[in-house]
Amino acid sequence: VIDFPISNMSNSGIDHIQVYIRRKPQSLTAHLGTGRHYNINSKSGNLQILYSGLGMNMSLYNNDIASYIENLEYIEQQLEEYVVIAPSYMIYTQDYNKLLNTHIESGADITLLYHSVDNAKEYFLNCYAINLNKQKGVLSLEQNHGNTKNKNIFMDTYIMKKDLFIELIHKSRKTSSVYTLLDIVNASCEDLDIRGVSHRGYFAAISDFNSYYESNLSLTDIKTAQNLFV
């Protein structure tokens, strides 16, 4: 599944990619290799695998913010003005360069990608949903409890300036050791201009075995597969 976000980034012209993982990286390192098969192994680009060495067995504290804190120097070293953050458990195709342009043109502080679904009662129960105003400004993020069928499922994909990203990392750690990036972004909805952009095309969230099975089954349909691969 991790091949999809990396391919999206590579196909969007992003050649500095950092992969953050929660557990020991041997198997993932072997799978990703140098990144050559993603067309990012060039003189100017690289693929880094980073993780939090502290609290490896303390899953509550070993979250994305913990990994960012421990590898902050690698983030600060990057010369790019913007960061694109994407999940490893969601399957979709997206031109991040186009999404970045939309973000810049909007003047927003943060842009979040979401997918509108009409089956949220049965699916995406481990995901978060975005509550939007009429101008697609993000009011809040809340876990999908399956109470309604129509939801804007947050695709765990963010775009923001690198400096703001670093600021949120520090703010999150000061607030709580268990805070995630999603938590601090959600807490910042009133203070920052956070906007949602709707995704079109195939979308699946692989959060358990059933969702893995369902997504594979859906891709046996030619029209469905074309929405992802064409």
Task: List the predicted regions and their residue ranges.
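Left-handed beta-helix
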Residues: 163, 171-230
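Conserved N-terminal catalytic core of the sugar/cofactor nucleotidyltransferase
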Residues: 1-82, 98
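Acidic metal-phosphate-binding loop of nucleotide-sugar-dependent transferases
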Residues: 89-91
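Conserved core of the sugar-phosphate nucleotidyltransferase
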Residues: 93-168
